[in-house]
Amino acid sequence: MKIAIFSDTYLPQINGVVTSTQTFSRELEKLGHKVLICGPKMKGATRLTHKVWRFRSFTFPFQKEYRFINPFSRILRRFKKLGVDIIHVQTPFSMGYLGQYLGWKYKIPVVHTYHTHWEEYLHYFPLFPKNIEVDIYP
């Protein structure tokens, strides 16, 4: 199978999502699958290769390590020709939206992995009441 992994974070960043993306990629390739990683272009990142596609991006206003991508990249014209069988989205943000959109547009199945326990971050957002109950089950 040809699998495209979409993530808002990738090397040279180091975090749990990057580690997960690398692990998925390595293990899927061991099983004989071809993997394409789609992530943001950033300082120190490798250039476009057959395995990693980089999208122009800009920093998130109050979190400099996170980036938004420009979804109007010319490389998207080549996406359909790749013959991707499944899209694995690793983020609910800009690259995740792009992966979901491409899945819808080209009728490619999409799976999504959440890496953040959102209920543990609600207290950082003043719009949510302090006594809100969140029922999230693994």
Features from the language model and the residues they span:
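Active-site proximal beta-strand in glycosyltransferases
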Residues: 3, 86, 103-121
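An amphipathic, basic-hydrophobic alpha-helix
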Residues: 61-89, 95-101, 105
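Short glycine-enriched, charge-decorated loop/helix-capping segments at active-site entrances
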Residues: 125-131
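N-terminal subdomain of nucleotide-sugar transferases
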Residues: 1-54, 79
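Membrane-proximal helix-turn-helix segments that form the acceptor-binding/catalytic region
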Residues: 105, 132-138
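A short acidic, helix-capping loop that chelates divalent metal ions and anchors anionic groups
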Residues: 60-63, 119-124
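Structural motif
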Residues: 38, 89-90, 113
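Short amphipathic alpha-helical segments
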Residues: 49, 99-102, 125
